[in-house]
């Protein structure tokens, strides 16, 4: 328990020599007056405290140790297990290196600087396409030819080609049937083409091809002269395409059958003027087949083209 420090009484003030002498020379004065004066003189001054000895703090209260859980339960206390150490990686032992008397390899040469090609210039923007002119103009004889006239040029060339093909087909069919018709009572046997069905078939096909080619020739000639078809064009195109195809197939089939029959005749009886003239007619029929095939292509073009 700490003791509070109480203020010590202030010491009495020192008396001056004059006051002391006065006091001594007046013995008859009362002691009470002298004490009262001394209190008044020292009432306004602070009292001085002397040095006090330091007191030591009280000793701490002794603490009794608390019994552990093992002591309370009465079981023996086992020491804590030692901490586990983590395995440290140790590099495998390396065999000792043999002494190499050769000098160390020279340091690699510095790599040559890689030359970076300069960046390619940016591509220029493509120019804007020119406006398309609906009608092409061609300068011819200081005049402007409109687009419709340019479209008529391929048509005129195609019509001339078809006209030439019709003339050639008519002439070839006429020549084939004329040679075959003249092949009568020829050779040592005085044989005739009319005795064989294959040769009669070839003769009939050549007659049909000649008549059809002459008819188509006059139709095309009138179209080129008047620029007008004799029959409606859609139906006329179908008719031309169909007839060209049929006559081409008939010519190739009749010529093939006649060739087989003449070859059999030569194998049995030998060669004489009769089979030679028959072979000539068959060769002309093959040529007529090629012309009709060209005419069939032109007819197909006219049929499937929309601007005619």
Curated annotation (Swiss-Prot):
GO cellular component: plasma membrane
Compositional bias ranges of the Low complexity kind: 32-44
Pfam family name, one: CASP_dom
Span list, region Disordered: 1-135
Protein name in UniProt: CASP-like protein 4A2
Membrane-spanning residues: 162-182, 204-224, 241-262, 281-301
Compositional bias segments (type: Pro residues): 54-65, 89-132
Membrane topology: Multi-pass membrane protein
Topological domains annotated Extracellular: 183-203, 263-280
The family this protein is said to belong to: Belongs to the Casparian strip membrane proteins (CASP) family.
Side Cytoplasmic, residues: 1-161, 225-240, 302-308
Subunit and partners: Homodimer and heterodimers.
Source organism of the structure: Oryza sativa subsp. japonica (Rice)
Localization (cell): Cell membrane
Residues listed as glycosylation sites in the UniProt record: 195, 279
Keywords (A to Z) from UniProt: Cell membrane, Glycoprotein, Membrane, Transmembrane, Transmembrane helix
Membrane is among the record's keywords: yes
Gly residues: bias regions: 22-31
Main location class: membrane
């Amino acid at each position: 328990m700490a003791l509070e420090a109480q203020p010590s009484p202030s010491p009495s003030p020192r008396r001056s020599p004059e006051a002391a002498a006065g006091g001594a020379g007046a013995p008859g004065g009362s002691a009470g007056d002298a004490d009262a004066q001394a209190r008044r003189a020292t009432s306004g001054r602070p009292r001085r405290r002397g040095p006090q000895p330091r007191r030591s703090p009280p000793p701490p209260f002794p603490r009794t140790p608390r019994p552990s859980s093992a002591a309370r339960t009465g079981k023996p206390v086992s020491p804590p297990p030692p901490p586990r150490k983590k395995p440290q990686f140790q590099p495998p032992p390396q065999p000792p290196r043999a002494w190499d008397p050769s000098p160390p390899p020279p340091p690699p040469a510095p790599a040559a600087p890689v030359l970076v090609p300069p960046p390619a210039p940016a591509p220029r923007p493509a120019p804007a396409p020119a406006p398309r002119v609906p009608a092409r103009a061609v300068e011819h004889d200081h005049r402007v030819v409109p687009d419709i006239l340019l479209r008529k040029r391929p048509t005129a060339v195609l019509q001339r080609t078809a006209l030439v093909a019709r003339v050639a087909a008519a002439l070839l069919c006429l020549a084939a049937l004329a040679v075959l018709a003249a092949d009568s009572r020829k050779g040592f046997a005085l044989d005739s083409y009319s005795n064989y069905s294959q040769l009669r078939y070839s003769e009939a096909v050549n007659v049909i091809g000649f008549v059809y080619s002459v008819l188509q020739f006059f139709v095309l000639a009138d179209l080129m002269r008047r620029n007008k078809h004799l029959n409606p064009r859609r139906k006329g195109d179908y008719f031309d395409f169909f007839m060209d195809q049929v006559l081409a197939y008939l010519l190739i089939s009749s010529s093939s059958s006649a060739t087989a029959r003449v070859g059999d005749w030569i194998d049995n009886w030998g060669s004489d003027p009769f089979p030679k003239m028959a072979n000539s007619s068959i060769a002309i029929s093959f040529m007529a087949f090629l012309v009709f095939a060209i005419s069939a292509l032109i007819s197909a073009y006219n049929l499937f083209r929309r601007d005619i």
